[in-house]
Structure formats: C-alpha cells, structure tokens
C-alpha cells in the first residue's frame, strides 16, 4: 500500500538494492519487534510501580516453589508476575493490562512528534511512519477482547472482565490469592472456601479455568473431600489444550495417584502415568507416584518403606514455606498410610476368622450328616 505513494515509489526505484531490502524487509521486521518490546516494557513498568515483580523463570525446575505445585504465576505475554500485596488487586491488574497498549500508543506519538520529519528523506520518513504505525496497530489489536489459540486472554479481554468485575474477574482474583497462599505455605485446608467457589464458578475451559480447577482439586483432596476432588480433577483434565505444559503432566500424575490411592486401581494408575512425558517428573514426584502404585498393588509395606526416600527428596529442595507445606502434607500422608495399613490388617484378620469359622461350621455339618 505504501509503495503506491508516488514519492515513496520513486525513492524506492532510485534506491540501491541494499536500501530496498532495508526499507521493505528489515524496517517492518524491526517495527514488529519494537511494538512487542514496547508493550512488554509498558507492562513491566506498570507492574513494578504497582507493587508487582517479575517472578523467576523455572530454570531449576525441581527447586522453584511454583514447581512443587505446578502452579505458574500470573503471566502477561511471556512475563510471570507475582505480588505479596493483595490489596486493591483488581484495580492494579487493570492498570497493568492497560500499561502495555498505552506504552505502544505513547511511543508512536512520541516518535511522530519528537521532531519535524518533513525535512528528512522519503526513506527516513517511511521508516519512522512504519515503526509508529506498527506500534499503533499492535496496541489497538491487543485491546481487542479475544482469547488466543491456547485459551489465553488478550489485554483487551482482561480489561473487559476486570472493568465489568464479572465471574471471570472474580476467578482471576481468587486464583491469584490461592497461588499466593500456596507459595506462603498456607495449608489448602485453611483457604477461604469462597476462593474455591469463585474460582470454579465459570468453567469456560480457558487457561484460568484449568489452573483454578487444579487449585480447587488440591483444596478438596487435602480436606479428604473425594467427591469434589474427583469432579475438579476430571474437569481440569477435560481441557488439555488450555492446560499449561507443566500442569498437564502434573494433572496426569495426580490422576494416576488418585486412581492408585483412592480407588486402589493400579491398572488405571499405570494408564495415566504412561501419558506423562518422559523426564518431566522430578525426584519427589516420581517417588510419590511409586508409593501410590505400590499401595494400589497391595504392597503396603513396600509403599511405607518408600516414605523415607520421599522425605529425603523433599529435604533436597531449598528451604521455603512451600517446601515446609509439602513436608507437612507428606507427614499427613504417612499417618494416613499407617491408619489404612491397620485397617487392612484388621480386615485381613477378620476375613481369616470368617473363613476359619465357615470351615469349622462346614466340618460340623459334615460330621452331623455322617452320624
């Protein structure tokens, strides 16, 4: 379209091949990159000013507190953000999501009006206008309320839900509060049930919905509410395309453990475990799965002996509230195993006594019949 302008067409025709490549390929590519970078800078600056910080990326995957619960922090584009301050959260998030598009528009205006470009060459003017135009278009596009192909919300969709304060906004706020509680080591049983209710009220199979259902599953399973835990886990597994990569394998892991521990079904446990990508499980996750499968196979003493390896793997993690919570949950699991082992032992003894009694009764009847 721009090459249809007479002055620009004449300038391109008279330019050298290298200048033409720069004008037609390099400049648009740099404009796209600059538009993306400016929006990220806008998000970061707004987040830092509003009490958020960029969360560490999962370089040491088995040591990050988020990794222990496969619970990624809030992401804006590729940036993970977190905050300890939960006050005025909706207002602060609104400004953060608005920061990126506003930064792009402000940069375009600044670039256009920082000086009089009319005295520059036509090719220079083209470069300036191209960069400014791409920033404006990218900012306007990000304000469109749409959901991406991986069920991620655009800045515009986030702004709409936060300004309307609808069920999806309530879900986002509840999700962030539960994530913060996990990282601070607050036991899921102590969470406000209203958080879980708001987090699971709107299951639109988006990324937010899947993460919320996962957190609700943790809450329900720690409360031994097996009915609710089953529902939350099944709903989370029903939307694999919206599930973050790390969480998808963790859901398969939990499905395997659920079948082994609560259903005593080793066959289904192995089926779910087979879906986990090779090498994705870290040490403490693999040991937890091994214990659960051994239990389902009836090898309760072998499962109990593996507990020491599980505790050792947890102690290898850096000290943090999240590690302390994981160790507390593991200790509770140990007590549950001991209790269920006693139940199994009493059940076995009762069955044996019933068999002995039945055999004795049958022998008495045979003797009476013979007499």
Predicted regions and their residues:
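Hydrophobic alpha-helical transmembrane segments
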Residues: 15-26, 119-137
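Topogenic membrane-insertion module of multi-pass membrane proteins
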Residues: 1-35
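Small-residue-rich helix-interface/hinge motifs
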Residues: 27-87
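Juxtamembrane/interfacial segments flanking transmembrane helices
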Residues: 53-55, 143-172
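Generic helix N-cap/helix-start motif at coil->alpha-helix transitions
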Residues: 170-174, 205-214, 243-253, 281-288
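Alpha-helical repeat scaffolds
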Residues: 190-201, 226-240, 264-279, 299-313, ...
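"A position-specific structural signal for the A-helix of alpha-solenoid helical repeats
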Residues: 215, 253-254, 258, 285-296, ...
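Charged, amphipathic alpha-helical linkers/stalks
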Residues: 158-210, 214
């Amino acid at each position: 379209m721009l090459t249809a302008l007479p002055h620009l067409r004449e300038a391109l025709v008279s330019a050298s091949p290298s200048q033409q490549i720069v004008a037609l390929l390099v400049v648009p590519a740099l404009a796209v990159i600059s538009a993306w970078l400016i929006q990220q800078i806008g998000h970061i600056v707004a987040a830092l000013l509003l009490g958020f910080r960029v969360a560490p990326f999962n370089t040491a995957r088995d040591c990050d507190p988020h990794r222990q619960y496969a619970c990624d922090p809030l992401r804006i584009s590729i940036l993970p953000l977190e905050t300890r301050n939960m006050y005025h959260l909706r207002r602060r998030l609104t400004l953060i999501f608005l920061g990126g598009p506003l930064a792009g528009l402000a940069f375009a205006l600044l670039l256009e009006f920082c000086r009089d470009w009319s005295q520059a060459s036509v090719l220079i003017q083209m470069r300036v206008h191209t960069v400014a135009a791409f920033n404006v278009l990218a900012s306007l596009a990000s304000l469109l309320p749409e959901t991406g192909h991986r069920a991620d919300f655009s800045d515009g969709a986030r702004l709409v839900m936060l300004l309307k304060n609808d069920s999806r906004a309530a879900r986002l706020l509840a999700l962030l509060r539960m994530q913060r509680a996990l990282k601070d080591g607050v036991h899921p049983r102590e969470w406000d049930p209203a958080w879980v209710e708001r987090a699971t009220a709107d299951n639109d199979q988006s990324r937010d919905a899947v993460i919320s259902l996962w957190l609700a599953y943790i809450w329900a399973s720690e409360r031994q509410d097996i009915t609710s835990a089953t529902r939350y886990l099944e709903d989370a597994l029903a939307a694999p395309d919206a599930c973050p990569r790390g969480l998808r394998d963790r859901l398969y892991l939990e499905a395997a453990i659920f079948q082994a521990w609560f259903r005593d079904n080793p066959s289904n446990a192995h089926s779910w475990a087979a879906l986990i990508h090779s090498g994705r499980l870290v040490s403490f996750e693999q040991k937890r799965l091994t214990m659960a499968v051994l239990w389902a196979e009836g090898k309760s003493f072998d499962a109990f002996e593996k507990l020491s390896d599980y505790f050792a793997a947890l102690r290898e993690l850096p000290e943090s509230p999240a590690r302390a919570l994981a160790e507390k949950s593991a200790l509770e699991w140990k007590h549950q195993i001991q209790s269920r082992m006693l139940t199994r032992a009493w059940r076995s003894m009762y069955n044996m006594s019933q068999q002995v009694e039945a055999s004795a009764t049958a022998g008495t009847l045979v003797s009476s019949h013979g007499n």
